[in-house]
């Protein structure tokens, strides 16, 4: 008896583009072994599942914080809270967040900031129907720098500090390394408009990480932070907000350098506006920073950020999607589709936007997923509606397969 099975949909996205007439995808164990035109004839011993909606690869969220549930600093569930939470509490939060991700069609997450390397122990939970995890451990930052409370502090002026930090990550078995090249909104006192590292120590850190066979991505909210990360040879830029006094926009020369270096940018777009607190309830340091930046209309700021990503596309820069899930109240886990929708709102074609959360994202995370292609992992997603004409369909998952095993279904089954 054949161990193969197939799934057929009249509408499909293969990871790079929409396929006219749909596809039939043949699966054996955890891999795709064949991809055929929609109405192909299958051997009689290959069971077929026919689905409505749009079939596509499972989504890949390139920027999550599994130890946090998305609240402001100091509140239970925040990144700052996670820095002092016990192991059991962290494990519960991580598991809850992984469940939220897979329920939203996300089959791989890249965690870019935990506590005590706690997330690494949650890799390999596919048997429980939970997403694959690519993990960085605690992000590297300077004393009192952004997210210092997560435990990844290094002192660039202390001999051996960078070497010890990289050696620990290699010993722990991280999949990627993250460094905070600028300050951030979530850490009072950090410099969101400057650079946290001088070029020489950051270049030394990048060289150490590369010598260990790992990639390094840099948190960059400011123009100076992005400039030093590019000059140091980092592999990717997270946020790339390019904040400066009076606004946020990437200088053309910086975009040209990012493109020439072949770097990947994750703009971490997307949020749930209904979860934003009233401005009067926001922490004072965030209100102060918004005033320094001249941001008076939150909605217009986000719309401008979406439009700004067109400049990345125009310069040929590789873009991937990650929500920064768990970082604040408006970024709960399982909302990656909003990142893709923001690209479309900014002017991206739907197929290119969806690719940032499938094939491009999988490549950047180093996983053999993100494509409906023979040899790739059978991480599959069905969404309700025609994704090619309605990007919000990405937020309506009806079935999810992880490594060929159905782990979520909201669709009716025969009998």
Language model feature labels by segment:
Residues 1-43, 54-55, 385-390, 405-406:
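N-terminal metal-binding scaffold of metallo-dependent hydrolase/deaminase domains
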Residues 10, 349, 354-359, 374-415:
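C-terminal cap of metal-dependent C-N hydrolases
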Residues 54-125, 229-232:
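Metal-associated gating/positioning segment near the N- to mid-region
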């Amino acid at each position: 008896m054949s161990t193969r099975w197939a799934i057929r949909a009249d509408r499909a996205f293969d990871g790079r583009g929409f396929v006219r007439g749909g596809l039939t995808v043949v699966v054996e164990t955890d891999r795709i072994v064949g991809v055929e035109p929609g109405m192909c004839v299958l051997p009689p011993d290959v069971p077929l599942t026919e689905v409505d909606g749009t079939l596509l690869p499972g989504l890949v969220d390139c920027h999550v914080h599994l130890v946090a549930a998305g609240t402001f600093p100091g509140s239970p569930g925040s990144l700052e809270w996670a820095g002092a939470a016990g192991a059991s509490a962290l494990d519960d939060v991580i598991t809850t967040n992984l469940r939220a991700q897979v329920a939203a069609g996300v089959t791989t997450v890249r965690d870019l900031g935990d506590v005590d390397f706690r997330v690494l122990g949650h890799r390999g939970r596919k048997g429980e129907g939970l997403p694959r995890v690519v993990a960085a451990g605690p992000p590297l930052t300077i004393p009192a720098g952004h997210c210092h409370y997560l435990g990844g502090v290094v002192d660039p002026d202390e001999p051996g500090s960078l070497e010890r930090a990289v050696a620990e990550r290699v010993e722990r078995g991280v999949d990627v390394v993250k460094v905070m090249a600028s300050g951030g909104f979530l850490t009072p006192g950090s410099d969101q408009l400057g650079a946290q590292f001088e070029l020489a120590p950051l270049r030394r850190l990048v060289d150490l990480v590369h010598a260990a066979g790992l990639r390094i991505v840099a948190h960059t909210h400011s123009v100076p932070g992005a400039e030093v990360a590019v000059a140091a040879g980092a592999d990717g830029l997270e946020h790339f907000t390019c904040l400066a006094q009076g606004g946020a926009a990437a200088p053309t020369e910086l975009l040209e350098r990012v493109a020439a270096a072949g770097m990947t940018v994750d703009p971490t777009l997307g949020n749930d506006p209904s979860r934003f607190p009233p401005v009067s309830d926001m922490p004072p340091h965030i209100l102060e920073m918004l005033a320094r930046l001249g941001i008076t209309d939150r909605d217009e700021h986000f719309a401008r950020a979406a439009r700004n990503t067109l400049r990345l596309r125009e310069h040929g820069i590789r873009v991937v999607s990650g929500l920064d899930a768990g970082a604040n109240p408006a970024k709960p886990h399982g909302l990656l589709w909003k990142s893709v929708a923001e690209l479309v709102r900014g002017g991206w074609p739907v197929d290119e936007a969806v690719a940032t959360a499938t094939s491009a994202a999988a490549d950047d995370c180093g996983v053999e997923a993100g494509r409906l292609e023979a040899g790739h992992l059978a991480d599959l997603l069905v969404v309700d509606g025609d994704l090619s004409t309605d990007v919000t369909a990405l937020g309506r998952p009806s079935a999810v397969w992880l490594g060929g095993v159905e782990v979520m279904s909201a669709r009716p089954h025969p009998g």
